[in-house]
Amino acid sequence: MKKNIIAGCLFSLFSLSALAAIPAGNDATTKPDLYYLKNEQAIDSLKLLPPPPEVGSIQFLNDQAMYEKGRMLRNTERGKQAQADADLAAGGVATAFSGAFGYPITEKDSPELYKLLTNMIEDAGDLATRSAKEHYMRIRPFAFYGTETCNTKDQKKLSTNGSYPSGHTSIGWATALVLAEVNPANQDAILERGYQLGQSRVICGYHWQSDVDAARIVGSAAVATLHSDPAFQAQLAKAKQEFAQKSQK
C-alpha cells in the first residue's frame, strides 16, 4: 500500500514538473496586449538550447573577443545605433524596423501592423527565453567586467537578469521574420536590420555573442509557435491586408 502511495506521489510530482517546464510568469492570460501565447504553449528554451559557454572555453574566448570588438565601435556611428537599439519599449521595436520596412510602422500610420508587432513582443523576448535565462542566470558582459554599457538606462535592472539567451535579440529576429513575411519585397533589408539589432547587444555590452546567436534560434522557434495561434494568425492577416492596401496607393 505504501509503495502504491509513494509511486502515485512521484507520478504526480513528475507530471506537474512536465507541465511546468516554463517558469511561471506573465503570458496571454495576464498581459494579453504583450503576449499571444500562454505559458504552456511556449517553447522551452532550456530544452532547445545547449548550455552557454563556460568561462575559459574556446567559445568563451570568442565571446570575449567579440565583446572587445564591439566595445571599440561604441564611439562610432554604429555605436550610436547600438545605443538607440537598446530601447525597444513603447513602440521602439516598430520604429527600429520602419526604415527597412519602407514606411513608418506607427499606431497612426499602420495600426494593424503596429498591433501585431507590439502584441508579440514578449512572446519572443520573455516567454521564449524564460526557462534558459532563469536556469543558467549567466552573468552579462558589463557585470563580468565591472564596466558600463553604451546605454545605462536598463543596466541596474538587467544586472540581475540572466544573459543567455538575449531577449532583445529574440524580439528583433522574430520581428524581422514576421515583417519579411508581410513585405517579402524588402525581406533582405528587414532581415539585415533584425540581425543588426542582435549585434547591437554585443556592441553595447549587454550580451555575449553566444547569447545573441542562441536568441536567433529561440526567436525563430517563437515565430513558428506563434503561427499556430489563432489570434496571431488573425492579426497577421489584418496586417497583410493593411499592407496590401497601402501598397496600392
Swiss-Prot record:
The keyword ATP-binding does not apply. It catalyses: a phosphate monoester + H2O = an alcohol + phosphate. It is found in: Periplasm. InterPro entries: Acid_Pase_classA_bac, Acid_Pase_classA_bac_CS, Acid_Phosphatase_PhoC, P_Acid_Pase_2/haloperoxi_sf, P_Acid_Pase_2/haloperoxidase. The keyword Signal applies. PROSITE patterns: ACID_PHOSPH_CL_A (PS01157). Residues 1-20 form the signal peptide. Keywords: Hydrolase, Periplasm, Signal. Its EC number is 3.1.3.2. Pfam families: PAP2. Optimum pH is about 6. Homotetramer. Belongs to the class A bacterial acid phosphatase family. This is Major phosphate-irrepressible acid phosphatase. It comes from Morganella morganii.
